[in-house]
From Swiss-Prot:
Protein's UniProt name: Coiled-coil domain-containing protein 116
Region (Disordered): 41-68, 329-395, 509-541, 565-613
Domain of life: Eukaryota
Cellular component annotations (GO), alphabetically ordered: centrosome; cytoplasm
Compositional bias per record (Polar residues), positions renumbered to this chain: 51-60, 512-539
PANTHER family in the record: COILED-COIL DOMAIN-CONTAINING PROTEIN 116 (PTHR36861:SF1)
Biological source species: Homo sapiens (Human)
Pfam families, per the entry: DUF4702
Biased composition (Basic and acidic residues): 577-589
Signal peptide: none
Coiled coil: 79-104
Length: 613
């Protein structure tokens, strides 16, 4: 009877048997923690007794004499409900790791089913959401494997059967095949866990999670947790790990799932898609400029500053200022006297022999200036076949004043006289004319080149800058100032100053004509000397007073030769001697008339005094 109770399959009957049967059969086979074993339900049908022979029972007793400590530890975790707490910890840790993202917004750890291949190129969700896991969460159960795990073969079979019915659906064939492998089976088939995760994801999509039975939810929960903990680091694992895992599984995959040999290209494709996605996210995070100069031409000031066009424009003005500042006479004195010492002299870079002048005397250029090739090309294009602006004349020598070129500049400011003495030779006058003419042509070509450059720039960029001609005009009239090589604009316009400058320039032009006519005469009379000195003094004083009133920095402006051209025009165009004699006669007549008027006034005053007396 005790033997029948022993083979009945009820652990409660074995424990409730009489003491002799219990001492003989049950005591040596008791587990470490018997009070924590879950009792079977009384309504459950027991399994038939084991059909193994006496040799099998002796082998089981032999195994139980030397129990494996790892197997007892797993049994302890299962029976004492420690796995429930471990599952909760793993679940929360997995949720937190899955929620972490990098700075680019990409998940730090991507949990994904490696077996599932989405159709149509769509990627499945990485893992079920937290709400789905909690909805399917019931008390987890652990399938520890085949019979012979526990002291009583019948009770272990019944316990394993109940756990298989509750959580491991469709795994009887695998459990029955594991009887000869030992007391504890190896790790569960990963393919089954992956299938359960796939089913859980499908239930989440279709919304059928609430209609499932309790036993199915138990299996889904445990399998999904096992798959989550095993695949939460798939982003860092190599591809061979998945292929080896799938190759070691003994189960046959479904028809819709790919074969284990096809997993390698699939994972390579997924890695490629991840790289493309990361590259696209990096492109979106780049800081593009706020505007494009080609599409928004009204914001091209930044474009000019970035391409260093402002220094190029400023260098044009600086070169003109340096050239005017470094101009010297033959005797070494500066052409434009100023309180500042010239900082740069123009080096003579070679000159071709000068052609004979109107008087037949050849004159070499003392300090020629060479223009850049670009400037020469622009001059050829602008001035065409003009004899006064040819590249050879501008680049290598000074050109004497001709009536054709003098007619182009009608209203120019007179150049200040180098010396007020009447002993200045005819040679120095010619040199003065040549130098003034050359500098005037250089300034005019610079203005034309700058104006065309601004015109082309306004067409390309779509905005109008300040015309250089207006700036130079304001510089000549004193409305703007040049400090060093930079132009400082002034917002105030003085009309009175403008009129005064124009009147002074007109007087100086008339005085320069008188002084030129006096210098051209070869035999001046004694009576003409006072008048000539007076005319030269009048010509010198307005120029000096006007020149000294201006700031020293404005005296170096590139507009000065353009304004002083009228004086050169008067001095350069030497009239015939007959015309000079006529001018001298007119001057004599005017002087005599003035003397007669003075004598008449004195006589009238004397007569009035006598009458009064």
């Amino acid at each position: 009877m005790a033997r029948c109770r022993h083979h009945s399959g009820y652990l409660a009957d074995d424990e409730a048997s009489h003491s002799m049967c219990s001492a003989r059969v049950q005591l040596p086979k008791k587990p470490l923690v018997p009070e924590m074993r879950p009792a079977c339900k009384p309504g459950r049908v027991p399994h038939p007794p084991s059909t193994c022979g006496s040799s099998a029972l002796q082998g089981q007793r032999r195994n139980k004499r030397h129990p494996q400590p790892f197997g007892h530890f797993l049994d302890f975790l299962t029976e004492s409900q420690v796995l429930d707490s471990l599952e909760t910890v793993v679940e929360k840790a997995t949720e937190r790791m899955a929620a972490m993202k990098t700075e680019a917004g990409v998940p730090l750890v991507e949990v994904q089913d490696p077996v599932e291949v989405p159709s149509g190129g769509r990627r499945a969700h990485a893992r079920p959401s937290l709400s789905t896991v909690h909805r399917h969460r019931v008390r987890p159960t652990l399938c520890t494997g085949h019979p012979n795990n526990y002291p009583s073969s019948s009770s272990s079979m019944s316990n394993c059967h109940s756990s298989l019915m509750a959580g491991c659906l469709g795994s009887h064939s695998r459990d029955s095949d594991l009887g000869a492998q030992g007391s504890l089976p190896p790790v569960r088939d990963k393919l089954l866990l992956e299938k359960n995760l796939k089913r859980l994801l499908q239930l989440e999509r279709e919304g059928k999670g609430l209609s499932q039975s309790c036993s199915q939810r138990d299996s889904l929960l445990w399998d999904s947790l096992g798959s989550q903990t095993s695949f939460q680091w798939t982003q860092e694992q190599p591809l061979s790990w998945f292929s080896g895992l799938l190759g070691s599984s003994s189960g046959v995959p479904e028809a819709s799932e790919p074969r284990p040999g096809e997993q390698e290209p699939i994972f390579r494709k997924r890695e490629f898609n991840k790289e493309i996605k990361s590259l696209l996210s990096q492109l979106e995070s780049l800081d593009l400029p706020g505007y494009c100069p080609l599409r928004e031409p009204h914001r091209t000031l930044n474009f000019l500053a970035d391409h260093r066009l402002f220094p190029a424009l400023q260098s044009v003005v600086s070169q003109a200022v340096d050239k005017l500042r470094g101009a010297h006479c033959r005797d070494g004195r500066p052409l434009f006297p100023t309180s500042l010492e010239p900082t740069s002299d123009l080096p003579p870079l070679g000159s071709e022999p000068a052609k004979p002048t109107n008087g037949g005397q050849p004159y070499a250029s003392p300090r020629p200036t060479v223009s850049s090739p670009k400037m020469l090309q622009r001059k050829r294009k602008d001035r065409g076949g003009s004899p006064s602006m040819s590249s050879a004349q501008v680049a290598t020598r000074f050109k004497l004043k001709s009536p054709c070129s003098s007619s182009r500049f009608t209203k120019k400011k007179p150049l200040p006289s180098i010396s007020s003495k009447s002993s200045m030779s005819h040679f120095s006058n010619r040199l003065y004319e040549e130098l003034a003419d050359f500098l005037t042509q250089q300034a005019a070509s610079l203005v034309i080149r700058k104006y065309e450059f601004e015109k082309d720039l306004s067409k390309q960029l779509g905005f109008f800058s300040f015309p250089i001609t207006h700036v130079l005009r304001d510089l000549s009239l004193g409305l703007k100032k040049v400090k060093g090589s930079r132009i400082h604009l002034s917002s105030e316009t003085h009309r009175s100053c403008l009129l005064r400058k124009l009147e002074e320039s007109k007087r100086a032009r008339q005085a320069s004509r008188l002084s030129t006519s006096h210098c051209s005469t070869e035999t001046p009379s004694v009576q003409q000397e006072p008048a000539t000195h007076t005319a030269q003094d009048q010509a010198t004083e307005p120029c000096r007073s006007l020149y000294t009133n201006l700031p020293a920095s404005r005296q170096l402006s590139p507009l000065e030769p353009k304004l002083y051209m009228s004086a050169c025009t008067g001095m350069g165009s030497s009239p015939p001697k007959s015309k000079d004699m006529d001018n001298e006669g007119r001057d004599k007549a005017e002087i005599e008339d003035e003397d007669e008027d003075e004598f008449k006034d004195e006589d009238q005053d004397e007569d009035k005094d006598e009458d009064g007396v």
